[in-house]
Amino acid sequence: MAVTPSLLRLALLLLGAVGRAGPRPQGATVSLSETVQKWREYRHQCQRFLTEAPLLATGLFCNRTFDDYACWPDGPPGSFVNVSCPWYLPWASSVLQGHVYRFCTAEGIWLHKDNSSLPWRDLSECEESKQGERNSPEEQLLSLYIIYTVGYALSFSALVIASAILVSFRHLHCTRNYIHLNLFASFILRALSVFIKDAALKWMYSTAAQQHQWDGLLSYQDSLGCRLVFLLMQYCVAANYYWLLVEGVYLYTLLAFSVFSEQRIFKLYLSIGWGVPLLFVIPWGIVKYLYEDEGCWTRNSNMNYWLIIRLPILFAIGVNFLVFIRVICIVIAKLKANLMCKTDIKCRLAKSTLTLIPLLGTHEVIFAFVMDEHARGTLRFVKLFTELSFTSFQGFMVAVLYCFVNNEVQMEFRKSWERWRLERLNIQRDSSMKPLKCPTSSVSSGATVGSSVYAATCQNSCS
Protein backbone atom coordinates (compact mmCIF):
# COMPACT_ATOMS: atom_id res chain seq x y z
CA MET A 1 0.00 0.00 0.00
CA ALA A 2 1.37 3.40 -0.92
CA VAL A 3 2.18 5.79 1.89
CA THR A 4 0.26 9.06 1.70
CA PRO A 5 1.99 12.38 2.45
CA SER A 6 0.13 12.62 5.75
CA LEU A 7 1.36 9.21 6.85
CA LEU A 8 4.84 10.11 5.68
CA ARG A 9 4.75 13.13 7.91
CA LEU A 10 3.67 11.06 10.89
CA ALA A 11 6.57 8.71 10.26
CA LEU A 12 9.06 11.54 9.99
CA LEU A 13 7.78 13.12 13.20
CA LEU A 14 9.13 10.14 15.08
CA LEU A 15 12.22 9.73 12.90
CA GLY A 16 13.12 13.34 13.61
CA ALA A 17 12.63 12.78 17.30
CA VAL A 18 14.87 9.71 17.49
CA GLY A 19 17.59 10.93 15.14
CA ARG A 20 19.09 12.68 18.12
CA ALA A 21 17.19 11.45 21.15
CA GLY A 22 17.38 14.72 22.99
CA PRO A 23 14.88 17.02 24.64
CA ARG A 24 12.18 18.52 22.45
CA PRO A 25 12.23 22.28 21.84
CA GLN A 26 9.21 24.16 23.05
CA GLY A 27 6.76 24.72 20.26
CA ALA A 28 8.08 21.75 18.29
CA THR A 29 5.84 19.64 16.11
CA VAL A 30 3.33 17.43 17.93
CA SER A 31 4.70 13.99 18.72
CA LEU A 32 3.33 10.66 17.59
CA SER A 33 2.37 9.73 21.16
CA GLU A 34 0.28 12.89 21.50
CA THR A 35 -1.42 12.15 18.18
CA VAL A 36 -2.31 8.64 19.30
CA GLN A 37 -3.65 9.93 22.61
CA LYS A 38 -5.91 12.34 20.70
CA TRP A 39 -6.97 9.46 18.47
CA ARG A 40 -8.01 7.50 21.54
CA GLU A 41 -10.13 10.42 22.74
CA TYR A 42 -11.68 10.69 19.28
CA ARG A 43 -12.45 6.96 19.29
CA HIS A 44 -14.07 7.22 22.73
CA GLN A 45 -16.31 10.08 21.57
CA CYS A 46 -17.21 8.13 18.44
CA GLN A 47 -18.16 5.01 20.39
CA ARG A 48 -20.43 7.10 22.57
CA PHE A 49 -22.02 8.63 19.46
CA LEU A 50 -22.55 5.20 17.89
CA THR A 51 -24.33 4.07 21.04
CA GLU A 52 -26.48 7.13 21.73
CA ALA A 53 -27.39 8.45 18.26
CA PRO A 54 -30.93 7.50 17.12
CA LEU A 55 -31.28 4.95 14.32
CA LEU A 56 -32.65 5.78 10.90
CA ALA A 57 -36.42 5.31 10.86
CA THR A 58 -36.83 2.39 8.46
CA GLY A 59 -35.43 0.81 5.35
CA LEU A 60 -32.06 -0.30 4.10
CA PHE A 61 -28.95 1.64 5.16
CA CYS A 62 -25.22 1.27 5.84
CA ASN A 63 -24.46 0.75 9.52
CA ARG A 64 -22.72 3.42 11.55
CA THR A 65 -19.13 2.52 12.29
CA PHE A 66 -15.69 3.65 13.37
CA ASP A 67 -13.11 2.57 10.79
CA ASP A 68 -10.03 3.60 12.83
CA TYR A 69 -9.85 6.85 10.89
CA ALA A 70 -13.21 8.64 11.12
CA CYS A 71 -16.59 8.24 12.82
CA TRP A 72 -19.39 7.41 10.36
CA PRO A 73 -23.15 7.77 10.88
CA ASP A 74 -25.76 5.57 9.24
CA GLY A 75 -25.68 6.06 5.48
CA PRO A 76 -28.57 6.00 3.02
CA PRO A 77 -28.05 3.47 0.21
CA GLY A 78 -26.65 4.60 -3.13
CA SER A 79 -25.14 7.83 -1.83
CA PHE A 80 -21.91 9.41 -0.63
CA VAL A 81 -21.54 10.07 3.08
CA ASN A 82 -19.15 12.72 4.37
CA VAL A 83 -17.86 13.73 7.80
CA SER A 84 -15.44 16.43 8.87
CA CYS A 85 -11.73 15.65 8.90
CA PRO A 86 -10.77 14.04 12.23
CA TRP A 87 -9.62 16.61 14.74
CA TYR A 88 -6.82 14.37 16.09
CA LEU A 89 -4.70 14.87 12.93
CA PRO A 90 -1.58 16.99 13.63
CA TRP A 91 -2.55 19.29 10.71
CA ALA A 92 -6.26 19.44 11.63
CA SER A 93 -6.19 23.25 11.92
CA SER A 94 -5.31 23.55 8.22
CA VAL A 95 -8.17 21.26 7.03
CA LEU A 96 -11.04 22.61 9.13
CA GLN A 97 -13.28 22.93 6.05
CA GLY A 98 -12.32 19.52 4.64
CA HIS A 99 -14.32 16.30 4.63
CA VAL A 100 -13.61 12.60 4.24
CA TYR A 101 -16.01 10.57 2.06
CA ARG A 102 -17.33 7.01 1.91
CA PHE A 103 -19.91 5.45 -0.41
CA CYS A 104 -22.92 3.43 0.70
CA THR A 105 -23.90 0.96 -2.03
CA ALA A 106 -27.47 0.21 -3.07
CA GLU A 107 -27.28 -3.04 -1.08
CA GLY A 108 -26.69 -1.10 2.15
CA ILE A 109 -23.01 -2.09 2.40
CA TRP A 110 -20.07 0.28 2.64
CA LEU A 111 -17.97 0.19 -0.53
CA HIS A 112 -14.62 -1.60 -0.22
CA LYS A 113 -11.46 -1.20 -2.23
CA ASP A 114 -10.96 -3.55 -5.15
CA ASN A 115 -9.67 -6.95 -4.05
CA SER A 116 -9.37 -5.74 -0.47
CA SER A 117 -11.22 -5.94 2.82
CA LEU A 118 -10.34 -2.32 3.58
CA PRO A 119 -13.09 0.29 3.20
CA TRP A 120 -12.92 2.79 0.37
CA ARG A 121 -12.31 6.35 1.56
CA ASP A 122 -11.59 9.64 -0.12
CA LEU A 123 -9.11 11.46 2.14
CA SER A 124 -8.00 14.07 -0.37
CA GLU A 125 -9.53 17.01 1.53
CA CYS A 126 -7.95 15.85 4.80
CA GLU A 127 -4.42 15.50 3.50
CA GLU A 128 -1.82 17.96 4.69
CA SER A 129 -1.43 20.89 2.34
CA LYS A 130 1.47 20.43 -0.08
CA GLN A 131 2.05 24.15 -0.36
CA GLY A 132 5.62 24.88 0.69
CA GLU A 133 6.29 21.16 1.04
CA ARG A 134 9.63 21.58 -0.67
CA ASN A 135 11.06 23.47 2.27
CA SER A 136 9.03 21.79 5.01
CA PRO A 137 10.83 20.32 8.03
CA GLU A 138 9.55 16.89 7.05
CA GLU A 139 11.24 17.12 3.64
CA GLN A 140 14.46 18.16 5.33
CA LEU A 141 14.20 15.24 7.75
CA LEU A 142 13.59 12.87 4.84
CA SER A 143 16.75 14.17 3.13
CA LEU A 144 18.74 13.65 6.32
CA TYR A 145 17.31 10.15 6.69
CA ILE A 146 18.47 9.21 3.19
CA ILE A 147 21.93 10.71 3.79
CA TYR A 148 22.61 8.97 7.09
CA THR A 149 21.19 5.65 5.84
CA VAL A 150 23.59 5.70 2.88
CA GLY A 151 26.43 6.76 5.19
CA TYR A 152 25.85 4.01 7.75
CA ALA A 153 25.43 1.37 5.02
CA LEU A 154 28.71 2.42 3.38
CA SER A 155 30.49 2.56 6.75
CA PHE A 156 29.13 -0.83 7.79
CA SER A 157 30.36 -2.50 4.59
CA ALA A 158 33.80 -0.86 4.72
CA LEU A 159 34.27 -1.66 8.42
CA VAL A 160 33.36 -5.33 7.99
CA ILE A 161 35.89 -5.66 5.15
CA ALA A 162 38.56 -3.76 7.12
CA SER A 163 37.99 -5.94 10.19
CA ALA A 164 38.32 -9.10 8.10
CA ILE A 165 41.61 -7.81 6.66
CA LEU A 166 43.14 -7.00 10.06
CA VAL A 167 42.07 -10.38 11.44
CA SER A 168 43.25 -12.38 8.41
CA PHE A 169 46.89 -11.22 8.34
CA ARG A 170 48.83 -12.62 11.30
CA HIS A 171 51.57 -10.00 11.02
CA LEU A 172 48.98 -7.27 11.66
CA HIS A 173 48.07 -8.69 15.07
CA CYS A 174 49.30 -6.11 17.60
CA THR A 175 47.89 -3.88 20.33
CA ARG A 176 47.45 -0.94 17.98
CA ASN A 177 45.36 -2.95 15.54
CA TYR A 178 43.41 -4.62 18.35
CA ILE A 179 42.33 -1.15 19.40
CA HIS A 180 41.41 -0.37 15.80
CA LEU A 181 39.35 -3.58 15.63
CA ASN A 182 37.39 -2.60 18.73
CA LEU A 183 36.80 0.85 17.27
CA PHE A 184 35.56 -0.81 14.06
CA ALA A 185 33.26 -3.01 16.15
CA SER A 186 31.80 0.03 17.93
CA PHE A 187 31.07 1.71 14.59
CA ILE A 188 29.51 -1.51 13.27
CA LEU A 189 27.29 -1.84 16.35
CA ARG A 190 26.30 1.81 16.08
CA ALA A 191 25.26 1.32 12.45
CA LEU A 192 23.37 -1.89 13.30
CA SER A 193 21.52 -0.21 16.16
CA VAL A 194 20.43 2.60 13.83
CA PHE A 195 19.26 0.05 11.24
CA ILE A 196 17.31 -1.85 13.92
CA LYS A 197 15.73 1.37 15.16
CA ASP A 198 14.70 2.38 11.64
CA ALA A 199 13.41 -1.14 10.91
CA ALA A 200 11.26 -0.98 14.04
CA LEU A 201 9.78 2.34 12.96
CA LYS A 202 9.18 1.10 9.42
CA TRP A 203 7.44 -1.96 10.79
CA MET A 204 5.18 0.26 12.84
CA TYR A 205 4.17 2.34 9.84
CA SER A 206 3.86 -0.53 7.38
CA THR A 207 1.34 -2.32 9.61
CA ALA A 208 -0.41 0.09 11.94
CA ALA A 209 -0.08 3.59 10.52
CA GLN A 210 -0.92 2.78 6.91
CA GLN A 211 -4.19 1.19 8.03
CA HIS A 212 -4.83 3.87 10.69
CA GLN A 213 -4.53 1.29 13.46
CA TRP A 214 -3.24 3.84 15.93
CA ASP A 215 -4.03 1.77 19.01
CA GLY A 216 -1.77 -1.05 17.87
CA LEU A 217 0.94 1.46 17.05
CA LEU A 218 0.91 2.92 20.56
CA SER A 219 0.86 -0.56 22.05
CA TYR A 220 4.15 -1.23 20.27
CA GLN A 221 5.56 2.03 21.60
CA ASP A 222 4.58 0.99 25.11
CA SER A 223 6.16 -2.45 24.76
CA LEU A 224 9.41 -3.46 26.42
CA GLY A 225 11.01 -4.40 23.10
CA CYS A 226 10.64 -0.88 21.72
CA ARG A 227 12.39 0.63 24.72
CA LEU A 228 15.16 -1.96 24.63
CA VAL A 229 15.84 -1.01 21.00
CA PHE A 230 16.47 2.61 21.94
CA LEU A 231 18.39 1.67 25.10
CA LEU A 232 20.66 -0.51 22.94
CA MET A 233 21.13 2.35 20.49
CA GLN A 234 22.17 4.71 23.30
CA TYR A 235 24.75 2.18 24.54
CA CYS A 236 26.19 1.62 21.05
CA VAL A 237 26.48 5.37 20.47
CA ALA A 238 28.16 5.87 23.85
CA ALA A 239 30.56 2.94 23.28
CA ASN A 240 31.51 4.44 19.92
CA TYR A 241 32.40 7.77 21.54
CA TYR A 242 34.48 6.03 24.20
CA TRP A 243 36.43 3.93 21.71
CA LEU A 244 37.24 7.15 19.87
CA LEU A 245 38.44 8.40 23.26
CA VAL A 246 40.59 5.26 23.65
CA GLU A 247 42.15 5.92 20.23
CA GLY A 248 42.97 9.47 21.31
CA VAL A 249 44.43 8.41 24.66
CA TYR A 250 46.51 5.68 23.00
CA LEU A 251 47.85 8.15 20.44
CA TYR A 252 48.82 10.56 23.21
CA THR A 253 50.44 7.71 25.18
CA LEU A 254 52.62 6.82 22.19
CA LEU A 255 53.74 10.43 21.87
CA ALA A 256 54.24 11.19 25.58
CA PHE A 257 55.70 7.92 26.90
CA SER A 258 58.48 5.94 25.28
CA VAL A 259 58.04 2.80 27.42
CA PHE A 260 54.78 1.27 28.70
CA SER A 261 53.15 -2.16 28.98
CA GLU A 262 50.87 -2.49 25.96
CA GLN A 263 49.22 -5.70 27.20
CA ARG A 264 48.30 -4.20 30.57
CA ILE A 265 47.10 -0.94 29.06
CA PHE A 266 45.00 -2.79 26.47
CA LYS A 267 42.94 -4.40 29.24
CA LEU A 268 42.35 -0.93 30.66
CA TYR A 269 41.25 0.29 27.23
CA LEU A 270 38.77 -2.59 26.95
CA SER A 271 37.26 -1.55 30.27
CA ILE A 272 37.00 2.06 29.16
CA GLY A 273 35.58 1.36 25.71
CA TRP A 274 32.95 -1.24 26.59
CA GLY A 275 32.56 -0.89 30.35
CA VAL A 276 32.35 2.83 31.09
CA PRO A 277 29.27 3.42 28.86
CA LEU A 278 27.38 0.87 30.96
CA LEU A 279 28.00 3.03 34.03
CA PHE A 280 25.78 5.82 32.70
CA VAL A 281 23.51 4.15 30.11
CA ILE A 282 22.07 1.68 32.65
CA PRO A 283 21.34 4.41 35.26
CA TRP A 284 19.71 6.49 32.50
CA GLY A 285 17.48 3.53 31.61
CA ILE A 286 16.51 3.06 35.26
CA VAL A 287 15.68 6.75 35.68
CA LYS A 288 13.64 6.76 32.46
CA TYR A 289 11.71 3.69 33.62
CA LEU A 290 10.97 5.16 37.05
CA TYR A 291 10.28 8.82 36.27
CA GLU A 292 9.76 9.31 32.52
CA ASP A 293 8.36 6.04 31.20
CA GLU A 294 6.72 7.48 28.08
CA GLY A 295 6.54 6.01 24.59
CA CYS A 296 9.78 4.50 23.30
CA TRP A 297 12.06 6.80 25.33
CA THR A 298 12.81 8.59 22.07
CA ARG A 299 12.69 12.04 23.66
CA ASN A 300 13.64 13.53 26.97
CA SER A 301 11.31 16.09 28.47
CA ASN A 302 13.43 16.49 31.60
CA MET A 303 16.85 17.89 30.75
CA ASN A 304 18.41 16.53 33.96
CA TYR A 305 17.70 12.93 32.93
CA TRP A 306 19.22 13.47 29.49
CA LEU A 307 22.41 14.88 31.05
CA ILE A 308 23.10 11.46 32.61
CA ILE A 309 24.12 10.34 29.12
CA ARG A 310 25.10 13.66 27.57
CA LEU A 311 27.72 14.78 30.12
CA PRO A 312 29.95 11.64 29.88
CA ILE A 313 29.82 11.89 26.09
CA LEU A 314 30.77 15.58 26.26
CA PHE A 315 33.69 14.56 28.48
CA ALA A 316 34.92 12.08 25.85
CA ILE A 317 34.56 14.68 23.09
CA GLY A 318 36.43 17.28 25.16
CA VAL A 319 39.35 14.99 26.00
CA ASN A 320 39.73 13.97 22.36
CA PHE A 321 39.72 17.61 21.32
CA LEU A 322 42.56 18.33 23.78
CA VAL A 323 44.47 15.35 22.38
CA PHE A 324 43.87 16.72 18.89
CA ILE A 325 45.33 20.12 19.86
CA ARG A 326 48.31 18.46 21.56
CA VAL A 327 49.08 16.25 18.56
CA ILE A 328 48.86 19.20 16.17
CA CYS A 329 51.37 21.10 18.34
CA ILE A 330 53.76 18.13 18.26
CA VAL A 331 53.40 17.84 14.48
CA ILE A 332 54.19 21.56 14.06
CA ALA A 333 57.26 21.25 16.29
CA LYS A 334 58.59 18.26 14.34
CA LEU A 335 57.96 19.90 10.98
CA LYS A 336 59.85 23.01 12.06
CA ALA A 337 62.68 20.90 13.46
CA ASN A 338 63.16 19.34 10.02
CA LEU A 339 63.84 22.82 8.59
CA MET A 340 61.14 22.51 5.96
CA CYS A 341 59.89 25.46 3.95
CA LYS A 342 56.67 27.16 5.04
CA THR A 343 54.70 25.77 2.09
CA ASP A 344 55.61 22.16 2.93
CA ILE A 345 54.83 22.76 6.60
CA LYS A 346 51.36 24.10 5.77
CA CYS A 347 50.61 21.23 3.40
CA ARG A 348 51.69 18.51 5.82
CA LEU A 349 49.95 20.24 8.72
CA ALA A 350 46.72 20.43 6.73
CA LYS A 351 47.02 16.75 5.81
CA SER A 352 47.63 15.74 9.44
CA THR A 353 44.73 17.88 10.64
CA LEU A 354 42.25 16.50 8.10
CA THR A 355 43.37 12.96 8.95
CA LEU A 356 42.95 13.40 12.70
CA ILE A 357 39.47 14.96 12.52
CA PRO A 358 37.58 11.74 11.62
CA LEU A 359 39.94 9.51 13.63
CA LEU A 360 39.28 11.43 16.86
CA GLY A 361 35.78 12.70 16.11
CA THR A 362 36.92 16.31 16.47
CA HIS A 363 34.01 17.58 14.35
CA GLU A 364 31.69 16.84 17.30
CA VAL A 365 33.09 19.89 19.12
CA ILE A 366 31.34 22.25 16.68
CA PHE A 367 27.87 21.64 18.14
CA ALA A 368 28.80 19.74 21.30
CA PHE A 369 27.46 22.40 23.64
CA VAL A 370 24.46 23.42 21.52
CA MET A 371 21.70 21.44 23.20
CA ASP A 372 18.76 20.22 21.15
CA GLU A 373 16.29 22.24 23.22
CA HIS A 374 18.13 25.46 22.28
CA ALA A 375 18.54 24.66 18.57
CA ARG A 376 15.65 25.90 16.46
CA GLY A 377 14.96 26.65 12.84
CA THR A 378 18.00 26.83 10.59
CA LEU A 379 20.43 26.20 13.46
CA ARG A 380 18.66 22.95 14.32
CA PHE A 381 18.75 21.74 10.71
CA VAL A 382 22.45 22.65 10.31
CA LYS A 383 23.22 20.88 13.59
CA LEU A 384 21.33 17.75 12.55
CA PHE A 385 22.88 17.77 9.07
CA THR A 386 26.43 18.18 10.41
CA GLU A 387 26.11 15.54 13.11
CA LEU A 388 24.14 12.91 11.18
CA SER A 389 26.07 13.19 7.92
CA PHE A 390 29.57 13.34 9.45
CA THR A 391 28.82 10.63 12.01
CA SER A 392 27.28 8.22 9.50
CA PHE A 393 30.24 8.49 7.08
CA GLN A 394 32.86 8.61 9.86
CA GLY A 395 33.08 4.82 10.03
CA PHE A 396 33.92 4.67 6.33
CA MET A 397 36.68 7.28 6.73
CA VAL A 398 38.11 5.44 9.76
CA ALA A 399 38.19 2.16 7.80
CA VAL A 400 39.99 3.88 4.91
CA LEU A 401 42.60 5.62 7.07
CA TYR A 402 43.29 2.79 9.53
CA CYS A 403 43.19 -0.05 7.00
CA PHE A 404 42.80 0.54 3.27
CA VAL A 405 45.55 3.18 2.89
CA ASN A 406 47.69 1.84 5.74
CA ASN A 407 51.25 1.01 4.60
CA GLU A 408 51.46 -2.16 6.69
CA VAL A 409 48.20 -3.49 5.23
CA GLN A 410 49.31 -2.68 1.70
CA MET A 411 52.64 -4.40 2.33
CA GLU A 412 50.85 -7.56 3.52
CA PHE A 413 48.74 -7.53 0.36
CA ARG A 414 51.89 -7.19 -1.77
CA LYS A 415 53.48 -10.10 0.08
CA SER A 416 50.38 -12.23 -0.47
CA TRP A 417 50.31 -11.30 -4.14
CA GLU A 418 53.99 -12.16 -4.58
CA ARG A 419 53.49 -15.44 -2.74
CA TRP A 420 50.55 -16.37 -4.94
CA ARG A 421 52.41 -15.32 -8.11
CA LEU A 422 55.54 -17.31 -7.23
CA GLU A 423 53.53 -20.39 -6.32
CA ARG A 424 51.66 -20.16 -9.61
CA LEU A 425 54.93 -19.78 -11.58
CA ASN A 426 56.37 -22.75 -9.73
CA ILE A 427 53.33 -24.89 -10.61
CA GLN A 428 53.51 -23.84 -14.26
CA ARG A 429 57.24 -24.59 -14.35
CA ASP A 430 56.76 -28.04 -12.84
CA SER A 431 53.89 -28.89 -15.20
CA SER A 432 55.87 -27.77 -18.27
CA MET A 433 58.86 -29.93 -17.28
CA LYS A 434 56.92 -33.18 -16.64
CA PRO A 435 56.49 -34.31 -20.30
CA LEU A 436 60.20 -33.96 -21.06
CA LYS A 437 62.16 -37.23 -20.97
CA CYS A 438 65.62 -36.03 -20.15
CA PRO A 439 68.38 -37.72 -18.18
CA THR A 440 67.19 -38.24 -14.65
CA SER A 441 70.16 -36.65 -12.97
CA SER A 442 70.16 -33.37 -14.90
CA VAL A 443 66.40 -32.81 -14.87
CA SER A 444 65.90 -33.69 -11.25
CA SER A 445 68.79 -31.56 -10.15
CA GLY A 446 67.55 -28.62 -12.22
CA ALA A 447 64.04 -28.93 -10.86
CA THR A 448 65.34 -29.20 -7.34
CA VAL A 449 67.50 -26.13 -7.70
CA GLY A 450 64.64 -24.17 -9.28
CA SER A 451 62.21 -25.17 -6.55
CA SER A 452 64.71 -24.23 -3.88
CA VAL A 453 65.23 -20.79 -5.38
CA TYR A 454 61.48 -20.12 -5.52
CA ALA A 455 60.97 -21.40 -2.00
CA ALA A 456 63.79 -19.25 -0.69
CA THR A 457 62.44 -16.21 -2.50
CA CYS A 458 58.95 -16.81 -1.12
CA GLN A 459 60.30 -17.28 2.37
CA ASN A 460 62.28 -14.05 2.15
CA SER A 461 59.25 -12.11 0.94
CA CYS A 462 57.09 -13.37 3.84
CA SER A 463 59.62 -12.71 6.57
Curated annotation (Swiss-Prot):
InterPro entries reported for this sequence: GLP1R_7TM, GPCR_2, GPCR_2-like_7TM, GPCR_2_extracell_dom_sf, GPCR_2_extracellular_dom, GPCR_2_GLP1/glucagon_rcpt, GPCR_2_GLP1_rcpt, GPCR_2_secretin-like
Cytoplasmic-side segments: 165-175, 252-265, 329-348, 405-463
Gene Ontology BP annotations: adenylate cyclase-activating G protein-coupled receptor signaling pathway; associative learning; cAMP/PKA signal transduction; cell surface receptor signaling pathway; feeding behavior; hormone secretion; insulin secretion; learning or memory
PTM remark: N-glycosylation enhances cell surface expression and lengthens receptor half-life by preventing degradation in the ER.
Tissue specificity statement from the Swiss-Prot or TrEMBL entry: Pancreatic islets, stomach, lung, rat insulinoma cell line.
Keyword Isomerase: no
GO terms of molecular function: G protein-coupled peptide receptor activity; G protein-coupled receptor activity; glucagon receptor activity; glucagon-like peptide 1 receptor activity; peptide hormone binding; peptide receptor activity
Membrane topology: Multi-pass membrane protein
Disulphide-bonded residues: C46-C71, C62-C104, C85-C126, C226-C296
Annotated site residues (Interaction with the endogenous ligand GLP-1) in this chain: R121, E128
Bilayer-spanning residue ranges: 140-164, 176-201, 228-251, 266-290, 306-328, 349-370, 384-404
PANTHER family: GLUCAGON-LIKE PEPTIDE 1 RECEPTOR, PDF RECEPTOR-LIKE PROTEIN-RELATED
Protein name, entry field: Glucagon-like peptide 1 receptor
Organism annotation: Rattus norvegicus (Rat)
Underlying gene: Glp1r
